[in-house]
């Protein structure tokens, strides 16, 4: 694996000079191998190690290099044709392979090669970009988008129209992460490498980026870039110091543990916030 990483790192340093015409065999094979490993879930752009999320930047570099070495090509689709550098993940799947891998794909869901979809996942008409990882038992609902390199945990529900931000560039930026057993409400947007920690519930229409204040009304604490585990979050506003205006924020209205979350309906949690 280290040899593979070394090839990617060296090629990335001279990426400006690499084209589909002059890319050598070693680079092509290395990039193809990485994309295949991402596609199978053997590698992932980010993973939790000793309780901390670690981003493997060299894998992002491999994805970016794939755009340098590949030309656009005609891609066949269900009702149309497309023209892009990245083939669709399921282009060569037959019924046996779908059954073996154990997930459902509802047309016209679009999933790019180099993303991983785990068993017992349901993809409604949605979009999953290259480098993304969607773990077991999750639902990507209608018109939801999982951006490049985003990490979606086990038993996550991404409701209709949810946007999970992607990140390939700038290179040092970390991917957006939704940990296990989270619920993201309809039309919410989680972007810019924000981490929603395990067991959290995000209400409908909540927008969270790195600069969004995440206000805990019980403690008065303000978080940035991280929703603490077990949070129930709704959209709100915080007043300015002089009270002349207010600015949007996300509000943690309560905390729930895994036991409460498993026994209580999502709607009930969001209705009883007073």
From Swiss-Prot:
Could you provide one GO biological process annotation from this protein's UniProt record?
Answer: diaminopimelate biosynthetic process
Q: Where are its TM segments located?
A: none
Task: Tell me which InterPro entries the record gives.
Answer: DapD_Trfase_Hexpep_rpt_fam (IPR005664), Hexapep (IPR001451), Hexapep_transf_CS (IPR018357), THP_succinylTrfase_dom1 (IPR023180), THP_succinylTrfase_N_sf (IPR037133), Trimer_LpxA-like_sf (IPR011004)
Q: Which reactions does this protein catalyse?
A: (S)-2,3,4,5-tetrahydrodipicolinate + succinyl-CoA + H2O = (S)-2-succinylamino-6-oxoheptanedioate + CoA
Main localization is: cytoplasm
Q: Which GO terms describe its cellular component?
A: cytoplasm
- Record EC number: 2.3.1.117
- The lineage's top-level taxon is Bacteria
Pfam families per the UniProt record, alphabetical? Hexapep_2, THDPS_N_2
Q: Where in the cell is it found?
A: Cytoplasm
As for family, the record states: Belongs to the transferase hexapeptide repeat family.
Instruction: Show the HAMAP family listed in the entry.
Output: DapD
Q: What is this protein called?
A: 2,3,4,5-tetrahydropyridine-2,6-dicarboxylate N-succinyltransferase
Gene name as annotated: dapD
